[in-house]
From Swiss-Prot:
N6-(pyridoxal phosphate)lysine: residues bearing it: K118
Known EC number: 4.3.1.18
Catalysed reaction equations from the record: D-serine = pyruvate + NH4(+)
Designated name of the protein: Probable D-serine dehydratase
An annotated GO BP: D-serine catabolic process
Organism of provenance: Acinetobacter baumannii (strain AB0057)
Keywords: Lyase, Pyridoxal phosphate
Originating gene: dsdA
SUPFAM superfamilies cross-referenced by the UniProt entry: Tryptophan synthase beta subunit-like PLP-dependent enzymes
Entry-linked PROSITE patterns: DEHYDRATASE_SER_THR (PS00165)
Amino acid sequence: MKTVQLDQLKQQFPLIQTLQDYQETFWFNPHRYPLNEALAKVGLTEQDVKEAEARLARFAPYLAKVFPETQAQYGKIESALVKIADMQQALSLQKHKTLTGKLWLKKDSHLPISGSIKARGGIYEVLAHAEKLAIEAGLLKLEDDYSKLDQDSFRTFFSKYQIAVGSTGNLGLSIGIMSAKLGFRVSVHMSADARQWKKDKLRSLGVNVVEYASDYGVAVEEGRKAAEQDPFCFFIDDENSTTLFLGYAVAGLRLKQQFEQKQIKVDADHPLFVYLPCGVGGGPGGVSFGLKLAFGEHVHCIFAEPTHSPCMLLGVYTGLHDQISVNDIGLDNITAADGLAVGRASGFVGRAMQQLIDGYYTIHDECLYELIALLNQTENIQVEPSAAAGMMGPYYVQTTPDYLALHQLSAEKLQHATHVLWATGGGMVPPDEMQKYLTHSQSN
């Protein structure tokens, strides 16, 4: 972006200067529409989400058979929702501000199969593609027991096809693991931010890992180009895929079921706040769509991004979406939160969800390290830095009077609020890597 254009943009959007200075900030969205109007702009419906849930149910017998870790939930890929009262108390002490309401952790960090939120969207899209191919070939019917897919004849059939994806790590991991299990040939195009252990894990499964010295955007673009050369190759597009998005959206319906089981009330007097780490936007965007369908006006969805990679905040704030990158305003897009190291947000998610997402904030890397150490110390739960991005959300909400006034959130309502921190990854991090994360804040 030319300097002149940037100067004009900064006059119109003064918050850009704060982003350029790598400062932490909270911006709440003044452009939210009434719920039904905003949902209509997404281009997808509740019926689409229910069909995604039904597809996952069809695959459950197969998943339970080939991934023993899913057997306890009969092949359902779902994570626990746990109360973290000690963490809440520790955060209150750290910020010298009593955080009211109840704090919960949604442990997508420990989802079965691939240990991150990407197990929702990534695995779902691979399954949807496999189902389509097998049905078109006359090998599978919707009413079949899908555990039959665990046969050499199906693996041989799928081996004629290739799946490709560009990733900073976790999406590649989920798609690589699932595709290889079904028998597909897989190529994962990985950016410079991707952790070595994730590449090693994929290679051990026979996945072709293509490494780039550049960032996420280049890995996606090169993956897309390579896939276009092969008519038998299906490219999973993290930036634009509605299938991925629907896989994530199922989480909203599932969380509502968990709330019912735990008798957690959500209504006008008992608001729900959900804090979601955001990279390119597909995961948090899809989950938020599902949450808005499930809880309506009573759920507040807040996105969290590293100060070095605030691509969704920048795109939605300026209205430029994927037409602007963090590099255009001079940011380096280098962060310890490798899963969030994305310079240009998904245009599809930004435009679809801009009237639904309630707020956005940025967080320093050092703060991420402190938060994962605090969670480990108070709750004995280990997550990766990306997963901690949402943990400052309750503090921002409760210390921003304009936001509270806009949504008519009284002290009494906040007293009865539920706060859910969506932990997005970390369950598969090797112990020695996790130890480095946890000791980082002590050594600085």
